[in-house]
A protein has these predicted regions:
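A short, well-structured alpha-helical segment
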Residues: 174, 178-210
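Hydrophobic face of amphipathic alpha-helices that form TPR/SEL1-like repeat modules
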Residues: 26-33, 60-67, 98-100, 257-265, ...
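Structural signature of tandem alpha-helical TPR/SEL1-like repeats
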Residues: 38-41, 72-80, 233-238, 268-278, ...
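Terminal, low-structured helical/coil segments at or just beyond the last alpha-helical repeat
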Residues: 99-144, 378-379, 404, 411-413, ...
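Short proline/glycine- and basic residue-enriched helix-capping loop/turn segments at helix->loop/beta transitions
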Residues: 126-170, 196-241
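Alpha-helical adaptor scaffolds
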Residues: 27-54, 296, 300, 332, ...
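Short helix-capping/linker turns of helical repeat alpha-solenoids
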Residues: 37-38, 51-55, 67-69, 74, ...
Length: 459
């Protein structure tokens, strides 16, 4: 992953703080609930995080059991959770466990051991946590280094108002050395810089690979600051140190940001395997985007061994908190291979949820699904084009908009329009130096009066 500066009229980019979306249960919400004496919610949230292996939540849950707050008082459960937190390095938890142990009734330690066995590190490693390996970077990371970076204009409204911010994007680099449909994982402030980043990635060039090679997963950190100069670099170093300090202090959001900095800044240039422990800590702390990062990494073997069942578990947790990237990923996973009616229904449901939240990718992938599915099977070409207009309003040079529109037109039986639209997609793709093979295949289908029902978008 690289850091890209956006320059326009004397503007260039430096690091900005990214904020994590709130989870259904996270340390902050649990602590706030406890402060308000809402012990029922605090207990529920601490328990959810404690069962993921979060040591601070395990200690707080132990304290609540010992005091009978939010649940029936139980020294056995208090001892069990304090012991788990102690196993994870908490000195306060060890002191509490040592205090409780002499007062336990005979046989109580066996009950506590059963709880520890279910939620101890060994069990979580086997059932949920990624297996981090240094050589898990199977892909050629050099392909993520741009040959040419396209610098879009600084957004005019942001410039006129002096707005600063940043975007963290993940994307696939195809064998032709160009990107497709980047996923904007973080954007702050929302709705300001995303379009500029998509334009940059659409027109940037990367190293080509042999035809038929698999796409490679890459990430890029875009930072927008008004009126900054090169002497701001020490502030970047200071920000990294401060973020690490907060991350080491147990703040889940700082842990997520530091994970991004590790793989995002050329100055740190760490492999994904070094960021995974920080993403995991943040995920255990209830940060949905970190849960998505862990889940996606497990699906792809990105920084860890590929373990799909674990990945799907984390993705579902993130999706249940409304994390749109997780929802889209679950949808695309359901559509792998030859999906049956139930898998199609699941995929459509996840995409509907992502689209309803306003997610760009939710609307994009839903429009592609509706455009390439026969009406009898749940497709809806008119709605596909309506969603497309929302996603690509004002965008003129991305072939994807024409690809989806052509598929929708063909699905409605208007093959003449589909052929013309697909030719426009091919014209724009040629200007971007895309591999034309899949586009020409679709053009041939429309020319022969056949709709396209295969996968349209690379994820």
């Amino acid at each position: 992953m690289t850091t890209t500066s956006i320059s326009a009229r004397g503007l260039w980019a430096v690091l900005a703080v990214f904020f994590c979306a709130p989870a259904a249960a996270d340390l902050r919400s649990a602590e706030d609930a406890y402060t308000r004496h809402d012990f029922t919610k605090a207990f529920h949230d601490f328990q959810e995080l404690a069962e993921l292996g979060q040591p601070m939540a395990q200690l707080d849950l132990a304290i609540m059991y010992a005091r009978g707050e939010g649940a029936r008082q139980s020294d056995i459960y208090a001892y069990a959770w304090a012991s788990l937190a102690a196993d994870n390095g908490s000195e306060k938890a060890k002191a509490l466990a040592d205090k409780l142990r002499p007062g336990l009734a005979p046989g109580s330690e066996k009950i506590a051991a059963d709880i520890r066995g279910e939620f101890g590190n060994a069990e979580l490693d086997a059932r949920l946590n990624p297996r981090i390996v240094e050589d898990a970077e199977h892909e050629d990371r050099s392909r993520c280094h741009p040959v040419h970076v396209y610098m879009p204009k600084y957004p005019e409204e942001a410039a006129s108002r002096g707005i600063q911010g940043g975007v963290y994007a993940e994307f696939s680099v195809m064998p032709d050395g160009r990107t497709r449909n980047p996923r904007i994982v973080y954007a702050f402030p929302s709705g300001t810089f995303e379009a500029a980043v998509r334009q940059s990635l659409l027109h940037s060039e990367y190293s080509e690979a042999k035809p038929g090679s698999a796409p490679i997963q890459c990430t890029q950190f875009y930072n927008f600051t008004w009126g900054a100069s090169a002497d701001q670099y020490p502030k970047l170093q200071s920000f990294v140190r401060e973020t690490l300090k907060n991350a080491e202090g147990g703040d889940p959001q700082s842990q997520a940001v530091y994970g991004m900095l590790l793989v995002g800044l050329p100055q740190l240039n760490a492999p994904r395997s070094k960021a995974i422990p920080w993403f995991l800590k943040a995920a255990q702390g209830g940060v949905p985007t970190a849960q998505y990062q862990i889940g996606f990494g497990l699906l792809k073997g990105w920084g860890c061994n590929c373990e799909e069942n674990k990945g799907l578990d984390w993705l579902r947790r993130a999706a249940q908190s409304g994390q749109p990237d997780a929802e889209v990923t679950l949808a695309m996973y359901a559509l792998k291979g030859h999906p049956d009616e139930e898998r199609f229904r699941q995929a459509k449901l996840w995409l509907e949820q992502a689209a309803a939240s306003g997610s760009h990718d939710g609307k994009l992938y839903l429009s592609a699904l509706l455009a390439t599915t026969p009406a009898a099977n749940g497709g809806d070409s008119k709605r596909a084009m309506s969603l497309l207009d929302e996603v690509y309003r004002g965008v003129k040079d991305d072939p994807t908009v024409h690809e989806i529109r052509a598929a929708a037109q063909a699905n409605m039986g208007d093959f003449k329009a589909a052929v013309n639209t697909e030719r426009e997609a091919i014209h724009k793709a040629g200007a971007l130096k895309w591999d034309m093979t899949p586009l020409n295949e679709r053009l041939a289908a429309y020319t022969s009066g056949q709709p396209w029902t295969g996968t349209l978008l690379i994820f």
